[in-house]
């Protein structure tokens, strides 16, 4: 099952192009009397595209143009961008723990091998196997990355997922 998050932009960072004209900022478009709506509301200062179907509407006088768009955002995208916007509070906490661990353990200029070793060492020295290896009594959280990243204990799967998250967030190709 895929888990999705939102993609966030500042309204003024977007450029709009109509026909053969040069790209315009939102402010320039507004000065021309053109309105842009997202899902039936005026475009906010900060746009967060949540997964699913969305509708852009451009209104210029009596002319109305509508465009439906589909947005999806994968876990890997969130790791690469180091942005867990749109995930549940619990999910965001796990991403943030992975991002923090990367910030604390990965330095600019490290080789791929050095990054792998740093991630390995962090996970091995900062967490333990849950219940001293007695997996039958392990809580559900012990099977996800939050086990070793937040609770500081987990099963093998927890270590593997946490390693993957940290590796991708540190720029390794996984």
Please name every model-derived segment.
Residues 89-148:
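Secondary-structure boundary elements
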Residues 2, 73-89:
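Low-complexity, Pro/Ser/Thr- and charge-rich linker/hinge segments at domain boundaries
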Residues 119, 146-174:
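Cysteine-centered nucleophilic/redox motifs
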Residues 33-61:
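Serine/threonine-rich, repeat-prone extracellular segments and beta-strand-based repeat modules
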Residues 16, 46-48, 140-143:
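Residue "hotspots" at secondary-structure boundaries inside conserved domains
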Residues 1-35:
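Solvent-exposed, low-complexity, repeat-rich "mucin-like" stalks and linkers
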Residues 63-73:
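Edge beta-strands of extracellular beta-sandwich domains
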Residues 2, 42-45, 114-118:
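Short glycine-rich, low-complexity/disordered patches
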């Amino acid at each position: 099952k895929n888990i999705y998050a939102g993609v966030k932009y500042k309204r003024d960072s977007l450029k709009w192009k109509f026909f053969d004209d040069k790209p315009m900022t939102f402010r320039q478009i507004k000065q021309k009397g053109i309105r842009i709506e997202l899902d039936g509301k005026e475009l906010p200062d900060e746009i967060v595209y949540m997964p699913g179907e969305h509708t852009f509407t451009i209104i210029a006088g009596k002319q109305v143009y509508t465009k439906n768009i589909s947005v999806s955002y994968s876990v890997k995208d969130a790791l690469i961008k180091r942005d867990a916007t749109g995930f549940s509070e619990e999910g965001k906490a796990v991403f943030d723990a992975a991002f923090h661990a990367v910030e604390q353990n990965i330095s600019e200029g490290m080789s791929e091998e050095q990054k792998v070793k740093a991630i390995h060492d962090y996970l091995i020295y900062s967490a333990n196997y849950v219940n001293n290896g007695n997996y039958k009594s392990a809580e559900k959280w012990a099977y996800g990355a939050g086990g070793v990243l937040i609770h500081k204990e987990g099963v093998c799967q927890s270590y593997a997922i946490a390693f993957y998250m940290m590796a991708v967030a540190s720029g390794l190709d996984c």
